[in-house]
């Protein structure tokens, strides 16, 4: 897939090439032309990739001179059980559903691992359905456009709460004609403008707003309360986003919470819960409040408008409710008063959610009414029902330091109650409304700017290893700075003719004295623990323990005793129970400055290795892990066992390629089968040559097999070019321990007693 090799900002033009190839190509050409035109005055150069999402058996393998992703590559992202789907079912609806899920995964991966700058597609009703939910899964702010035949009338099912833009196609998307040319050209130009505009504005405004943003829910019957709350929050320095509690409003607010646009919530009007429980037309769903609680942001909750359920015109109210107390808000909206029994159900729903919270929550309850209609002389005034609601919540909620329940002798629309809401919120939120808060969609661009600042600090670092800004969209400046300093030191050593020496460590004492000996790099991985327990290194590839958990345990032992030398983590990239992006962040936070791919499937061969590759547990996962780590600014030093693997790792951005010659042969538990020392020279050279064809600046080290002593390392280094040193694991700690302890004990045993 061509896009995998490019880390520059990139847009995807997506459609079904089997039925709309000409239209997709025309759109892609105009997107590229507009991007090039707009980019003349921009520092960003944006690439275009065409993505085929066809579900027929007709294969398309290219589209003019564009980078192209065939449908089979998108389909490979669809996981079902333990395998993948190799072909689509004959039923069109099922095929579209599968491709939709595959595309969603494909875009999610692209957004996480590349600089995805935007997506644009075209289609009829089926194509729009296929594209829209996948597009909606991307963060708000990333341009997302569909030219569609159904871009009119009821479009909520396509757009949801996202910022997806639908362009009416006017005519059917069936060939290029005078009308479709105009529509596709304009849509392509508008999309290109969104992309460049976002990239440029993000350079200047990467922090979305200096103000802490608060989401507030409102209904017409709680407007006085919300207006007073909003006015007070603005005076306190906060920005407010008000959402009409219509079902869609609550979902929109929680989507913005997930995206990082909202940092606190005053959920004053929770009436959507009533519609959900009873069956109204403005209902939330079962996930209401989940995003707020998962993000652990300040939440103040009240019971606004929980005295009513919403329906359309009076004639649409279900027959079983026709005898209930109904208030006709207008010709299109009818409100039904809730009962004591229903209020108990609302309280149970809310309490069940909030009792699971692991962050601070405050529930504020007004005793004298929950809406403008719940007041003396108004249609829904019912002190018994209101009292039941508030008392039920007090009884069900776990009132403790984490969850506070406060009851006030006010009506919800009294200014005193509004002030009490804000006071409770201020107790939980930052003292100042001014904070640095990034949205999900702006983080990658902010990362590039931070990287730029670091790289400007090191102007002498002008090789490929240092200067490609777009390689580091997810890098923290401090992480990237460590990487650059380490690589610069290594480059300085190489320029002075000194070898780079890396070492594996399985214990704190090994690492401590490797550093004392002057080693340049230390790598921790599970086989080090097994080696120092008297077992062979291959134990680290067998199901004896959790390899990644062992590395985290070893960090506590090793990192405190190593003072200056870079310490890297050996990562089992094929681990099916860890999300690699999250695990790498965990390693970074612990204190590791880089990673290596170990345990590695490279040590397997034959049918077993082939089966691993065929079942999605192959070396490619290790390449992906290294690429992800590289984008985070971590130092990457992967093992490669052949030239092809070296090429893949170099293209992934690896800083140091370690040419692995197999299990070390020396010592009491070393291997007996390996290449000869002479053969290893040829193998190491081939790996070095392949690496340098991709990245001439990459560092190459030799390792393993017959290379188990300083003499053997010197033999290889003197007979190769472009190989800069040696990395030892068994040879650095197991063999010295075997030899030193054996010799020391023998010396003691040789003491004469005469």
Curated annotation (Swiss-Prot):
One term of GO molecular function: catalytic activity
Q: Which UniProt keywords apply?
A: ATP-binding, Host-virus interaction, Nucleotide-binding, Plant defense
* CDD domains in the record: Tm-1-like
A single GO BP annotation from the record? defense response to virus
Highest rank taxon of the organism: Eukaryota
Region: N-terminal inhibitory domain NC; residue ranges are 211-431
User: Residues annotated as region N-terminal inhibitory domain NN?
Assistant: 1-201
Which InterPro entries would you find in this protein's record? Answer: Aldolase_TIM, Pyrv/PenolPyrv_kinase-like_dom, TIM-br_IGPS-like, Tobamovirus_resist_UPF0261, UPF0261_C, UPF0261_N
Report residues binding ATP: 18-20, 55, 92, 124-127
Q: Which Gene3D superfamilies match?
A: Aldolase class I (3.20.20.70), Uncharacterised protein family UPF0261, NC domain (3.40.50.12030), Uncharacterised protein family UPF0261, NN domain (3.40.50.12020)
Function, as annotated: Inhibitor of viral RNA replication which confers resistance to some tobamoviruses including tobacco mild green mosaic virus (TMGMV) and pepper mild mottle virus (PMMoV), but not to tomato mosaic virus (ToMV strains L, ToMV0 and ToMV1-2) and tobacco mosaic virus (TMV). Prevents tobamoviruses RNA replication by affecting the association of tobamoviruses replication proteins (large and small subunits) with host membrane-associated proteins (e.g. TOM1, TOM2A and ARL8), thus inhibiting the replication complex formation on the membranes and avoiding viral negative-strand RNA synthesis.
Under PANTHER family, the record lists:
UPF0261 DOMAIN PROTEIN (AFU_ORTHOLOGUE AFUA_1G10120)
- Give the record's subunit note: Homodimer. (Microbial infection) Binds, via an ATP bridge, to the tobamoviruses avirulent (Avr) replication proteins (large and small subunits, e.g. tobacco mild green mosaic virus (TMGMV) AC P18339 and pepper mild mottle virus (PMMoV) AC P89657) to inhibit their function after the translation of tobamoviruses RNA, but before the viral replication complex formation on the membrane surfaces; this interaction is not possible with resistance-breaking strains replication proteins.
Indicate the family of this protein. Answer: Belongs to the UPF0261 family.
Q: Additional info?
A: The Tm-1 allele present in the tomato mosaic virus (ToMV)-resistant tomato cv. Craigella isolate GCR237 (AC A7M6E7) confers resistance to ToMV but not the allele present in the ToMV-susceptible tomato cv. Craigella isolate GCR26 (AC A7M6E8). Transgenic tobacco plants expressing tm-1 exhibit resistance to tobacco mild green mosaic virus (TMGMV) and pepper mild mottle virus (PMMoV), tobamoviruses that cannot multiply in tomato.
What protein does this entry describe?
Answer: ToMV susceptible protein tm-1(GCR26)
Species of origin: Solanum lycopersicum (Tomato)
């Amino acid at each position: 897939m061509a896009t995998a090799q490019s880390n520059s900002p990139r847009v995807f033009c997506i459609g079904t090439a089997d039925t709309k190839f000409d239209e997709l190509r025309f759109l892609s050409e105009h997107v590229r032309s507009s991007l090039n035109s707009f980019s003349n005055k921009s520092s960003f150069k944006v690439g275009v990739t065409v993505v085929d999402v066809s579900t027929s058996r007709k294969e398309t393998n290219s589209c003019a001179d564009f980078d192209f992703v065939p449908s089979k590559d998108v389909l490979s992202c669809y996981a079902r059980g333990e395998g993948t789907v190799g072909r689509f079912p004959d039923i069109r609806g099922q095929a579209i559903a599968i491709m939709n899920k595959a595309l969603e995964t494909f875009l999610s991966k692209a957004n996480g691992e590349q600089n995805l700058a935007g997506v644009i597609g075209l289609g009829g009703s089926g194509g729009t359905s296929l594209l829209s939910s996948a597009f909606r899964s991307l963060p708000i702010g990333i341009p997302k456009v569909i030219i569609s035949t159904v871009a009119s009338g009821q479009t909520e099912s396509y757009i949801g709460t996202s910022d997806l833009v639908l362009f009416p196609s006017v005519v059917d998307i069936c060939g290029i004609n005078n009308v479709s040319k105009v529509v596709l050209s304009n849509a392509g130009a508008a999309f290109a403008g969104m992309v460049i505009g976002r990239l440029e504005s993000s350079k200047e405004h990467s922090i979305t707003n200096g103000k802490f943003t608060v989401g507030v829910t409102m209904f017409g019957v709680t407007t006085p309360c919300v207006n007073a709350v909003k006015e007070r929050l603005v005076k306190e320095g906060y920005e407010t986003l008000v959402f009409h509690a219509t079902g869609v409003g609550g979902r929109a607010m929680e989507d913005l919470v997930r995206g990082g646009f909202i940092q606190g919530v005053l959920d004053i009007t929770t009436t959507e819960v009533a519609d959900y429980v009873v069956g109204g037309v403005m209902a939330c769903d079962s996930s209401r409040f989940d995003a707020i609680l998962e993000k652990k942001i300040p939440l103040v909750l009240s019971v606004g408008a929980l005295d009513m359920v919403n329906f359309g015109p009076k004639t649409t109210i279900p027959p079983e409710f026709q005898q209930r107390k109904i208030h006709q808000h207008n010709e299109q909206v009818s409100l039904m008063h809730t009962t004591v029994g229903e209020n108990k159900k609302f309280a149970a729903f809310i309490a069940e959610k909030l009792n699971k919270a692991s962050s601070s929550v405050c529930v504020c309850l007004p005793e004298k009414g929950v809406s403008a209609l719940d007041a003396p002389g108004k249609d829904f005034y019912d002190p018994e029902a209101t009292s039941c609601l508030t008392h039920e919540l007090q009884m069900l909620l776990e009132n403790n330091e984490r969850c506070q329940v406060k009851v006030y002798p006010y009506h919800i629309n009294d200014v005193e109650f509004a002030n009490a809401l804000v006071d409770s919120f201020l107790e939980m939120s930052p003292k100042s409304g001014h904070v640095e808060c990034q949205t999900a969609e702006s983080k990658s661009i902010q990362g590039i700017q931070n990287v730029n600042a670091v790289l400007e600090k090191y102007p002498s670092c002008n090789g490929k290893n240092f200067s490609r800004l777009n390689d580091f969209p997810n890098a923290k400046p401090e992480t990237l700075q460590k990487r650059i300093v380490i690589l610069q030191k290594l480059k300085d050593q190489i320029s002075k003719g000194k070898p780079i020496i890396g070492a594996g460590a399985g214990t704190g004492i090994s690492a401590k004295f490797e550093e004392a000996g002057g080693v340049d790099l230390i790598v921790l991985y599970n086989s080090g623990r097994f080696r120092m327990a008297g077992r062979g290194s291959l134990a680290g590839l067998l199901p004896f323990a959790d390899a990644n958990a062992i590395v985290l345990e070893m960090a506590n032992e090793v990192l405190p005793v190593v003072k200056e030398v870079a310490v890297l983590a050996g990562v089992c990239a094929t681990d099916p129970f860890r999300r690699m992006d999250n695990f790498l962040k965990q390693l970074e936070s612990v204190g590791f400055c880089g990673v290596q791919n170990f345990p590695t499937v490279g040590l397997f061969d034959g049918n077993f290795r082939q089966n691993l590759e065929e079942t999605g547990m192959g070396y490619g996962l290790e390449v992906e892990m290294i690429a992800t780590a590289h984008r985070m600014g971590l130092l990457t030093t992967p093992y490669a066992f052949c030239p092809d693997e070296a090429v893949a790792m170099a293209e992934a951005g690896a800083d140091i390629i370690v040419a692995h010659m197999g299990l070390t042969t020396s010592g009491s538990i070393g291997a007996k089968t390996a290449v000869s020392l002479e053969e290893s020279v040829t193998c190491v050279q081939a790996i070095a040559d392949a690496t340098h064809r991709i990245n001439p600046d990459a560092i190459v080290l030799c390792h393993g097999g017959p290379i188990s002593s300083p003499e053997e390392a010197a033999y290889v280094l003197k007979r190769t070019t472009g190989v800069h040193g040696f990395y030892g694991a068994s040879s650095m700690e197991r063999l010295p321990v075997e030899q030193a302890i054996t010799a020391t004990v023998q010396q003691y045993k040789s003491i004469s007693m005469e």
